[in-house]
A protein has these predicted regions:
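TRAFAC-class small GTPase G-domain
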Residues: 1-131
Length: 131
């Protein structure tokens, strides 16, 4: 199982939010271990690959498990690889249905660094505004 940890100080509304980023990967047999890393989290970002529908299904599953573990903490769904829209397997109707359920969704491209900062800014703002 791979875990990459980074720290980022984020400014939002004149306040500093110190984000500790846990990039959790791994196969399904490590799922329970990965979820244990979430304990105490104030929020999270889920990432789905626009060109692989299965990653959206997995993100939805992870969200349900995270909400069960953490309660209703802030989250953002980043739909990555927006630069590969021609190869999309995730349709606009699927994104619209999640948006209608209140999911904050941001289109991103790690390759072109589009939307990535916006995703972190949105999460930081949501954490600061959480009750």
């Amino acid at each position: 199982m791979g875990v990459k940890i980074d720290r980022v100080a984020w400014q939002s509304g004149g306040r500093t939010v110190n984000l500790i980023l846990w990039d959790l990967h791994g196969e399904d047999e490590f799922q329970k271990m990965r979820m244990s890393y979430l304990r105490g989290s104030a929020g999270y970002i889920l990432v789905a690959d626009l060109t692989r529908k299965a990653t959206l299904d997995k993100a939805i599953q992870l969200h349900m498990e995270a909400q069960e573990l953490l309660g209703p903490v802030p989250f953002v769904l980043a739909i990555n690889k927006s630069d590969l829209a021609a190869d999309a397997e995730i349709g606009q109707e699927e994104i619209a249905s999640l948006t209608a359920l209140g999911w904050p969704i941001i289109s991103t491209s790690a390759k072109s660094n589009t939307g990535v900062q916006e995703a972190f800014a949105r999460l930081a703002k949501m954490i600061l505004e959480a009750p």
